[in-house]
């Protein structure tokens, strides 16, 4: 009898994979094991929960039981996988073990928390579970410090500001979204955040946190400090690789996989935020959807390589939303920026005047799909 496919994880990547497998095979045994409740929620909604007044439970779209029934699954929620015996093809938890024919790691990524004194006072918003643990503190907080001015930090800063809170955002870089685009392109959003009342502390460093009678004292460089009620770490994600490492798989930033989503072990695959596909970590929805479609075919006996097109990344800052695509972080591009009252189109071209990247905002986001077609893959 077939042991079927075991999937470790229950987030967006795991669910997309299940749906794609079940479109092609209704009966192959599918087992999912995850440390959380396995209820479905839309992770991008976490960037807007405060202004929307949503509680953690409001985010649930489908319970684990409903998911299991709909797709004929064996689910093991609230279960920590402790080990993978790759030779025997066995996954182990403290009280259980599962044989597999094929194993998929969809373990996601965890929020990186800077190593400063008092780091345990920092909150993270990387899952429904994490939000549930701190929703009362965040709802009651009047003064909020967001550490990190990247995509998530910028989204959260705007959301907390829209909810009427006093928001300070701190980052080492000289501009927001510094790892995604140059300052001349991000300046429109940066200006909008400042207009809304977000206090930007750029080229600044958090040095420590300390609980006080009236809140949390954040010590900064240059002998500065501010007092706040909550501190959120938005300094990026780290792929969860510990299990894969213990199983003897090849690890770099993430779990290394090839174009077939196969790890260094022929029977183990990786998908989603934990995977590093041919040297790239792509923690965005579209590449995960496309990867899940390809992996479902390969798990069922096909041999289909993943071919990713040029893809849009959306920055969900409602007062000034942005779409970007291509190699926006490249240092050698020349940016042609067209700004109007209704939005911006910024084109990044190389020495041969070939479009390599673009960023569009507000009403001009409708131009994104035309630009996307002209980007080299």
UniProtKB/Swiss-Prot annotation:
<keyword id="KW-0963">Cytoplasm</keyword>
<dbReference type="GO" id="GO:0005737">
    <property type="term" value="C:cytoplasm"/>
</dbReference>
<dbReference type="InterPro" id="IPR036188">
    <property type="entry name" value="FAD/NAD-bd_sf"/>
</dbReference>
<keyword id="KW-0285">Flavoprotein</keyword>
<dbReference type="Pfam" id="PF07992">
    <property type="entry name" value="Pyr_redox_2"/>
</dbReference>
<keyword id="KW-0274">FAD</keyword>
<comment type="pathway">
    <text>Nitrogen metabolism; nitric oxide reduction.</text>
</comment>
<dbReference type="InterPro" id="IPR050260">
    <property type="entry name" value="FAD-bd_OxRdtase"/>
</dbReference>
<comment type="similarity">
    <text>Belongs to the FAD-dependent oxidoreductase family.</text>
</comment>
<keyword id="KW-0520">NAD</keyword>
<dbReference type="InterPro" id="IPR023961">
    <property type="entry name" value="NO_rdtase_NorW"/>
</dbReference>
<dbReference type="GO" id="GO:0016731">
    <property type="term" value="F:oxidoreductase activity, acting on iron-sulfur proteins as donors, NAD or NADP as acceptor"/>
</dbReference>
<dbReference type="Pfam" id="PF18113">
    <property type="entry name" value="Rbx_binding"/>
</dbReference>
<keyword id="KW-0560">Oxidoreductase</keyword>
<comment type="function">
    <text>One of at least two accessory proteins for anaerobic nitric oxide (NO) reductase. Reduces the rubredoxin moiety of NO reductase.</text>
</comment>
<protein>
    <recommendedName>
        <fullName>Nitric oxide reductase FlRd-NAD(+) reductase</fullName>
        <ecNumber>1.18.1.-</ecNumber>
    </recommendedName>
</protein>
<dbReference type="InterPro" id="IPR023753">
    <property type="entry name" value="FAD/NAD-binding_dom"/>
</dbReference>
<dbReference type="InterPro" id="IPR041364">
    <property type="entry name" value="Rbx-bd"/>
</dbReference>
């Amino acid at each position: 009898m077939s042991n079927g496919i075991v999937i470790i994880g229950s987030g967006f990547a795991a669910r997309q994979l299940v749906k794609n497998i079940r479109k092609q095979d209704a009966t192959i045994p599918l087992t999912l094991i995850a440390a959380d409740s396995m209820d479905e929620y839309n992770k991008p909604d976490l960037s807007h929960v405060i202004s929307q007044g949503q509680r953690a439970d409001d985010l649930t779209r489908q319970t684990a039981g409903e998911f299991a029934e709909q797709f004929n699954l064996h689910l093991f929620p609230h279960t920590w996988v402790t080990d993978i015996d790759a030779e025997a093809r066995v996954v182990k938890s403290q009280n259980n073990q599962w044989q597999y024919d094929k194993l998929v790691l969809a373990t996601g990524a965890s929020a990186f928390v800077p190593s400063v004194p008092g780091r345990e006072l920092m909150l993270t918003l990387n899952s429904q579970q994490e939000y549930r643990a701190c929703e009362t503190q965040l709802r009651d907080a009047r003064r909020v410090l967001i550490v990190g001015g990247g995509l998530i930090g910028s989204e959260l800063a705007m959301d907390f500001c829209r909810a009427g809170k006093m928001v300070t955002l701190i980052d080492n870089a000289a501009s927001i979204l510094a790892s995604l685009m140059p300052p001349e392109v991000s300046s429109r959003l940066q200006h909008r955040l400042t207009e809304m009342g977000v206090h930007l502390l750029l080229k600044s460093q958090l040095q420590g946190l300390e609980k006080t009678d009236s809140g949390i004292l954040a010590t900064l460089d240059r002998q500065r400090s501010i007092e706040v009620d909550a501190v959120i770490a938005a300094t990026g994600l780290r792929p969860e690789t510990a299990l894969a490492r213990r199983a003897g798989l090849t690890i770099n930033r993430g779990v290394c996989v090839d174009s077939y989503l196969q790890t260094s072990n022929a029977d183990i695959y990786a998908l989603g935020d934990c995977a590093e596909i041919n040297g790239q970590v792509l923690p965005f929805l579209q590449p995960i959807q496309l990867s899940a479609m390809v992996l479902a075919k390969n798990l069922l006996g096909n041999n289909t390589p993943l071919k990713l097109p040029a893809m849009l990344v959306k920055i969900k800052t409602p007062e000034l939303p942005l779409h970007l695509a291509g190699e926006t972080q490249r240092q050698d591009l020349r940016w042609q920026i067209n700004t109007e009252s209704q939005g911006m189109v910024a084109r990044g071209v190389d020495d041969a005047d070939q479009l390599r990247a673009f960023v569009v905002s507000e009403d001009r986001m409708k131009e994104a799909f035309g630009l996307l077609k002209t980007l080299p893959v």
